[in-house]
Amino acid sequence: MKFTLVATVLLTFSLSAFAVEYPVLTTASPDQVGFDSQKLHRLDGWIQNQIDAGYPSINLLVIKDNHIVLQKAWGYAKKYDGSTLLAHPIRATTNTMYDLASNTKMYATNFALQKLVYEGKIDVNDLVSKYIPGFKDMPGDKIKGKNKLRIIDILHHVAGFPADPQYPNKNVAGKLFSQSKSTTLEMIKKTPLEYQPGSKHIYSDVDYMILGFIIESITAIPLDRYVETTIYKPLGLKHTVFNPLMKGFTPPQIAATELHGNTRDGVIHFPNIRTNTLWGQVHDEKAWYSMGGVSGHAGLFSDTHDMAVLMQVMLNGGGYGNVKLFDDKTVAQFTRRSPEDATFGLGWRVNGNASMTPTFGVLASPQTYGHTGWTGTLTSIDPVNHMAIVILGNRPHSPVANPKVNPNVFVSGLLPAATYGWIVDQIYGSLK
């Protein structure tokens, strides 16, 4: 009896001795971790000038050596109602939640895939058809290749799919039109390839819509429930969700985006298009109309603190505190440069050549990786300098510059703040 008790105690102690305890974020002054505070402070005035010039809002957080050294909000979470400037606009705070747009691809879909790969539940060399029944070449397809498409081809964006089929817009999608999730999967299967897989690189939302469906096939639960219960909740994240208005959040907690729904100030029309100022609903058309707000390519909302924890997970090699999601080998596998394009890992954008300067600036290490989002979001993770930066913004919350010429260019998108690399360089330039 005594021997059994002693053995149990020793075994428990032995296991606890080998338990991984990852670094967690604490706060520190910039000077404590190698920044020149005076130089870093110059960024404050420059960003405020951009807000004064019309950029809606910017939330910025900087991590260095496991410490949060800068966290600040500028501007307004909501300043317009339609085309009307509010008499009392709602200021952005460091707790404001933002539509992450394509950063969803990394912090929902990639995090889920990295976890599933680590757990041995999926291999990136598996065929897509293993998880999506009916995903195959059709007799009338001009370009074949779906039968042999692997998950790694999807992650590298070399799978042959078009960049944006615009499924919810019948005027553009034609026979591929869909405004329901179940129909959308069938339309994706029918979407013709635009090029022979592996022959070129085209960044495609369809790729990550497919990956979202694959995750749901493996886990047998919706994508949002999987990431919210197995990733965000264990990490203690309270402001990272899909469809926030359905999960207890209110519009004033969230940054607004486009002024007139998805109409680009009245020049785009399709059935069921939103026309009110978007506030708490995902901006992305495919995510909202075709996927019910939850998709592998867009739909996630978060704030800078929660994003900081997720970036720290990557810097830590897969965990945070006593939570382990995946390991450092998985991180290395997913952030390794693609042979087809040095600026891509497995989904992650990588600082592989000068074309990434507008994203990562000129001072970040070549090993830096992250992603951008159409709404005005950037994440930059630098394992060499043990540093990470998140910029959250609501760039579409401004008028369209010239709707008839280019409906996708907003007034705020013409300002220097729309180029993340400049902000990133000011931060790196403040290092001693």
Curated annotation (Swiss-Prot):
Keywords from the named record: Carboxypeptidase, Cell inner membrane, Cell membrane, Hydrolase, Membrane, Protease, Transmembrane, Transmembrane helix
Pfam families found in the cross-reference section: Beta-lactamase
Catalyzed reactions: Preferential cleavage: (Ac)2-L-Lys-D-Ala-|-D-Ala. Also transpeptidation of peptidyl-alanyl moieties that are N-acyl substituents of D-alanine
Enzyme Commission number(s) of this protein: 3.4.16.4
Localization: Cell inner membrane
GO molecular function terms attached to this record: serine-type D-Ala-D-Ala carboxypeptidase activity
NCBIfam families listed in its UniProt record: PRK03642.1 (NF002968)
Main localization (coarse): membrane
Main EC class the enzyme belongs to: hydrolase
GO biological process: proteolysis
Name of the protein this chain belongs to: Putative D-alanyl-D-alanine carboxypeptidase
Membrane topology (UniProt): Single-pass membrane protein
CC per GO annotation: plasma membrane
The family this protein is said to belong to: Belongs to the peptidase S12 family. YfeW subfamily.
Native species: Salmonella heidelberg (strain SL476)
Domain of life (superkingdom): Bacteria
PANTHER family: BETA-LACTAMASE-RELATED, BETA-LACTAMASE-RELATED DOMAIN-CONTAINING PROTEIN
Membrane-spanning ranges: 7-25
Transmembrane helix is among the record's keywords: yes
